[in-house]
């Protein structure tokens, strides 16, 4: 049987863990070849706590380099041997949220799209993934780098000589998010809970989702990867919730959801969802 190959394309260190961490751990545990390409170093991230606060952009501006170590440790927890960066580490800078001022180095969203597409298409041709995963058109919650990553990955999948059999978007399930938030009854002091309607996340309805992977067996690996991103993520002691620098509590969902953007779906369950991103592929 041919070894399955999956490629995840993400904008910043920690995105791979927050959106697809359990999926990555699941497929590495199955013996698949899993690669993660990260488009920036995440230099513009807000830093949690005081220990590494001086690394932030308005101080030493060394956060991006530090986050290479965090990403390396997180990927190791998920079973991936090393990080890969689009164009090499530091080629394009984290663009920040909408309204973030331009820095001295070219921002990811301002980069030459043709060059970026060619670099990613070349990586696809090198790695020959059976499955490629990136964000939905809104980038999950509207971050400019996530939206740009979606557009770039879509273009690269089209431009690559290697024909990617299945191309997915990682998405948030609206119903699962609401259920998870309702269950957050005991969160650490200082954290706040919001309704799903008050969050910037764009949830997908059940009838628009194509795949749901129930990955409770890999929750521990995902939580370990979250802990590795200590400048960006705080995990509750019970491991059931987490918060970013804004201290908004979010559930750790044991299921990760996907929309199939290109390719043929495999077998679906009674809910109408695939339960394996490799479903329908002939890897013999």
Swiss-Prot record:
Catalytically driven reaction(s): 1D-myo-inositol 2-acetamido-2-deoxy-alpha-D-glucopyranoside + H2O = 1D-myo-inositol 2-amino-2-deoxy-alpha-D-glucopyranoside + acetate
Transmembrane segments: none
Keywords, in A-Z order: Hydrolase, Metal-binding, Zinc
EC id: 3.5.1.103
Cofactor needs: Zn(2+)
Pfam families recorded: PIG-L
Textual note on the cofactor: Binds 1 zinc ion per subunit.
Entry annotated with the keyword Iron-sulfur: no
Binding site for Zn(2+): 12, 15, 146
GO molecular function: N-acetylglucosaminylinositol deacetylase activity; zinc ion binding
Enzyme kind, highest EC tier: hydrolase
Source taxon at top rank: Bacteria
Entries under InterPro entries matching the protein: GlcNAc_PI_deacetylase-related, LmbE-like_dom_sf, Mycothiol_biosynthesis_MshB
GO biological process: mycothiol biosynthetic process
Family from the record: Belongs to the MshB deacetylase family.
Role noted for this protein: Catalyzes the deacetylation of 1D-myo-inositol 2-acetamido-2-deoxy-alpha-D-glucopyranoside (GlcNAc-Ins) in the mycothiol biosynthesis pathway.
Protein's recorded name: 1D-myo-inositol 2-acetamido-2-deoxy-alpha-D-glucopyranoside deacetylase
Organism: Mycolicibacterium gilvum (strain PYR-GCK) (Mycobacterium gilvum (strain PYR-GCK))
Organism ancestry: Bacteria, Bacillati, Actinomycetota, Actinomycetes, Mycobacteriales
Recorded name of the encoding gene: mshB
């Amino acid at each position: 049987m041919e070894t399955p190959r999956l490629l995840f394309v993400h904008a910043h260190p920690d995105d791979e863990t927050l959106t697809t961490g359990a999926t990555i751990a699941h497929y590495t545990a199955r013996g698949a070849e899993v690669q993660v390409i990260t488009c920036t170093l995440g230099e513009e991230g807000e830093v949690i706590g005081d220990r590494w606060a001086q690394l932030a952009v308005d101080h030493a501006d060394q956060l991006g380099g530090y986050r290479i170590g965090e990403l390396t440790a997180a990927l190791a927890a998920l079973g991936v041997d090393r990080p890969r960066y689009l164009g090499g580490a530091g080629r394009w800078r984290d663009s920040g949220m909408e309204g973030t001022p331009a820095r001295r180095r070219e921002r990811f969203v301002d980069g030459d799209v043709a060059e970026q597409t060619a670099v990613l298409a070349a990586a696809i041709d090198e790695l020959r993934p059976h499955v490629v995963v990136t964000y939905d058109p809104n980038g999950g919650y509207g971050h400019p780098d996530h939206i740009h990553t979606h557009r770039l990955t879509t273009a690269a999948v089209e431009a690559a000589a290697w024909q990617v059999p299945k191309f997915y978007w990682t998405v948030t399930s609206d119903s699962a998010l609401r259920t998870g938030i309702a269950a957050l009854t005991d969160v650490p002091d200082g954290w706040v809970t919001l309704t799903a309607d008050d969050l910037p996340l764009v949830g997908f309805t059940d009838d628009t989702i194509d795949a749901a992977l129930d990955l409770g067996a890999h929750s521990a690996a995902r939580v370990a990867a979250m802990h590795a991103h200590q400048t960006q993520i705080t995990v509750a002691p019970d491991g059931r919730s987490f918060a970013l620098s804004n201290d908004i509590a979010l559930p750790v969902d044991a299921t990760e959801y996907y929309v199939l953007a290109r390719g043929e779906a495999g077998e679906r369950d009674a809910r109408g969802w695939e339960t394996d991103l490799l479903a329908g592929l002939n890897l013999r």
